[in-house]
Regions:
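Catalytic-core loop-and-flanking beta/alpha module that positions acidic residues
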Residues: 144-145, 157-158, 183-184
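A surface-exposed partner-binding patch
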Residues: 1-146
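Active-site scaffold segments
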Residues: 142, 169, 189
């Protein structure tokens, strides 16, 4: 039987606290981030239902499993990711923070082709990924984690023909780019766990 999301994250927390320097982080224990993080509980079923009703979506089960353990991570950089050969650390939004962010980010639809000054045909072709629709902003993308408020991990509820609902994609600003990250929350957490395990075990 494989480890659950909660079990993998508990191990990840330990790796992060013990190896923060190598990860380029402040000491989460000394700074008090980890203590605050430990106080954060999981989201309730009624909170999930409220979120789903607000946006007319059905949250994936693995997302609910993650958020049943921790409804956000505060300042603790829980998600240590290797995306496209870039090591990036994310904090997890709470469901309430996700709602707030949705009011100004990914709150409209805009294709890459709507920005010809930034995205030439060649650039769009280079970015092409048959799992992700060619948007820069899309109402069916939901940011759930952030890297310094300039990069976001997002749940994708409207994938392209080779993608799947609930896949995880990464938006990074300046230069703006959308990058496929994982087929699901489950795979994302598994990647985080493996990345830390391989580096620090």
């Amino acid at each position: 039987m494989g480890k659950t999301i909660k079990e993998k994250l508990k191990e990840a927390e330990k790796y992060i606290c013990e190896n923060f320097e190598e990860l380029g982080l402040d000491d989460p224990v000394e700074e008090g981030y980890f203590e605050e993080y430990e106080q954060i509980g999981g989201a309730s079923e009624s909170e999930f239902e409220d979120f789903e009703k607000t946006f007319g979506i059905k949250l994936p089960e693995d997302f609910k499993e993650l958020y049943s353990y921790k409804n956000g991570s505060g300042y603790f950089e829980l998600l240590q990711c290797d995306i496209d050969d870039r090591e990036i650390n994310f904090t997890l939004f709470s469901l309430e923070e996700m709602k707030k962010v949705k009011s100004y980010f990914q709150d409209r639809d805009a294709l890459l082709t709507d920005y010809p000054d930034y995205f030439t045909d060649d650039v769009i072709e280079q970015m092409r990924d048959n799992r992700i629709k060619p948007y820069l902003f899309h109402k069916d993308w939901f940011a759930f984690a952030t890297y310094l408020n300039c990069g976001y991990l997002m749940l994708d509820f409207d994938p392209d023909k080779e993608g799947k609902v609930g896949q995880v994609i990464f938006y990074i600003h300046d230069p703006d780019e959308i990058i496929y990250t994982a087929s699901s929350i489950d795979e994302l957490i598994d990647n985080v766990w493996k990345f830390l395990k391989e580096n620090f075990d």
